[in-house]
Curated annotation (Swiss-Prot):
It comes from Deinococcus geothermalis (strain DSM 11300 / CIP 105573 / AG-3a). GO terms for cellular component: cytosolic small ribosomal subunit. This is Small ribosomal subunit protein bS18. Signal peptide: none annotated. Residues 11-21 have a biased composition (Basic residues). Belongs to the bacterial ribosomal protein bS18 family. Part of the 30S ribosomal subunit. Forms a tight heterodimer with protein bS6.
């Protein structure tokens, strides 16, 4: 087996192929309110299938609201309202 040298490789595309539209923070436009750690249905929007907290680039939240959501999710996990991890996800 031979390896390709750096000069023979195809150049990688730089950046996204199409511009992404900016995500809007649902809390700043009044669509959602961070009410309480007991609102599990709202908190599940910000958790992945495996139980991880989604990053800002996926949720579109501002830094302030992302910190607040993270703390609220962690409180709900400690009170056993949300799981720390989900069971094995099969596709």
């Amino acid at each position: 087996m031979t390896q390709q040298s750096n000069t023979e490789r195809k150049p990688r595309a730089k950046g996204p192929k199409r511009p992404r539209k900016p995500k809007v923070d649902p809390f700043s436009i009044g669509e959602l309110e961070i009410t309480d750690y007991k609102d599990v249905k709202m908190l599940r929007r910000f958790i992945s299938d495996t139980g991880k907290i989604l990053p800002r680039r996926r949720t579109g939240l501002s830094a302030k609201h992302q910190r607040r959501i993270s703390q609220t999710i962690k409180i709900a996990r400690q009170l056993a309202l949300l799981p720390y991890t989900e069971k094995l996800v099969r596709k």
